[in-house]
Swiss-Prot record:
Belongs to the neurotoxin 10 (Hwtx-1) family. 51 (Hntx-8) subfamily. Hntx-8 sub-subfamily. InterPro entries: Huwentoxin-1 (IPR011696), Huwentoxin_CS1 (IPR013140). This is U3-theraphotoxin-Hhn1a 6. It is found in: Secreted. Disulfide bonds join C54-C67, C61-C72, C66-C79. Keywords: Disulfide bond, Ion channel impairing toxin, Knottin, Secreted, Signal, Toxin. Residues 1-24 form the signal peptide. The presence of a 'disulfide through disulfide knot' structurally defines this protein as a knottin. GO terms for cellular component: extracellular region. Pfam families: Toxin_12 (PF07740). One of its GO terms (molecular function) is toxin activity. Residues 25-52 form a propeptide.
Length: 87
């Protein structure tokens, strides 16, 4: 029983050591922190705010009309989803 525990411990320790060595050699090839941060905070053109002719959900609708599928709330002056109690 002690032999089995020792062999499991050595196997686990060997796997951890292998992981650490592989990670260290991989992180030397590239600057991991800078690369990771730049990929996280990269701004894609699809996600940039675009100017529209209509106001989207929860946008102010005083000067602009709401986009299709939304109505201008008479109380808050925001574009909201149409609902039976808002008609």
């Amino acid at each position: 029983m002690v032999n089995m525990k020792a062999s499991m411990f050595l196997t686990f320790a060997g796997l951890v050591l292998l992981f650490v060595v592989c990670y260290a050699s991989e992180s030397e090839k590239k600057e991991f922190p800078k690369e990771m941060l730049s990929s996280i905070f990269a701004v894609d053109n699809d996600f940039k705010q675009e100017e529209r002719d209509c106001a989207g959900y929860m946008r102010e609708c005083k000067e602009k009309l709401c986009c299709s599928g939304y109505v201008c709330s008479s109380r808050w002056k925001w574009c909201v989803l149409p609902a039976p109690w808002r008609r």
